[in-house]
Amino acid sequence: MIKWPWKAQEITQNADWLWDDALAIPLLVNLTAQEQARLIALAERFLQQKRLVALQGVELDSLKSARIALIFCLPILELGLEWLDGFHEVLIYPAPFVVDDEWEDDIGLVHSQRVVQSGQSWQQGPIILNWLDIQDSFDASGFNLIIHEVAHKLDMRNGDRASGIPFIPLRDVAGWEHDLHAAMNNIQDEIDLVGENAASIDAYAATDPAECFAVLSEYFFSAPELFAPRFPALWQRFCQFYRQDPSQRLR
């Protein structure tokens, strides 16, 4: 295990070129200059407060770490870094990893199974990612592992477990829940019609409300053109929660 393979001051010393290079990915190129400056400031603070822990031969340099920090901070650009309280480490495996998963069925029986995971997060504890999928998160494709796990963290600020309803005013909860479930049903209808592989939205969104919120958060930031026109009411709720409208950056 390698902790801090580079020093935080390296980013400060090389800031002029490093942040320009770190921002030069499809996910971030459409941010305004003002948004980029504020995102960099958040990312610098993120790297001061969190540890990136490279596991099983993963090598992190300043550029990789800066990009990871920028993506972590994109969802909380208008919320503030305090929304990422509750964890101090980001563990990074080289590829998806195997974990022992337990769940309780409808009659109370507990089952266990070894499953492959791309990432994990808990209310208190580290976020676990893998480098293979982190690299794919640089694109504006609708897939973003970092944003997915950040969304779970934001979701869990509203309770002990992720529910798909983040910390929003109580008066908005019923409408949020209605629109989120409508989106899940719509996605499931498409899956039933064309199959999981041909669906235009990741089929994982149809599994439960928490995953729907996390998956659609990926699309919100990395493929707004697929989210906004299909679920306009839910899109507006996401805009209100995140205090951003990524579709405006495409114009």
UniProtKB/Swiss-Prot annotation:
Keywords in alphabetical order: Aminopeptidase, Cytoplasm, Hydrolase, Metal-binding, Metalloprotease, Protease, Zinc
Cofactor(s) essential for the protein: Zn(2+)
UniProt key word Transmembrane: no
Molecular function, one GO term: metallopeptidase activity
InterPro entries referenced in this protein's UniProt entry, alphabetically: MetalloPept_cat_dom_sf, MtfA_enterob, MtfA_fam, MtfA_N
Chain positions recorded as Zn(2+) binding sites: H111, H148, H152, E211
GO cellular component labels: cytosol
Cofactor annotation comment: Binds 1 zinc ion per subunit.
Keyword Cell membrane: no
Localization (cell): Cytoplasm
Quaternary state and interactors: Interacts with Mlc.
Function field: Involved in the modulation of the activity of the glucose-phosphotransferase system (glucose-PTS). Interacts with the transcriptional repressor Mlc, preventing its interaction with DNA and leading to the modulation of expression of genes regulated by Mlc, including ptsG, which encodes the PTS system glucose-specific EIICB component. Shows zinc-dependent metallopeptidase activity.
Family statement drawn from the similarity comment of this UniProt entry: Belongs to the MtfA family.
NCBIfam families: PRK15410.1
Listed name of the protein: Mlc titration factor A
Provenance organism: Salmonella arizonae (strain ATCC BAA-731 / CDC346-86 / RSK2980)
Name of the gene: mtfA
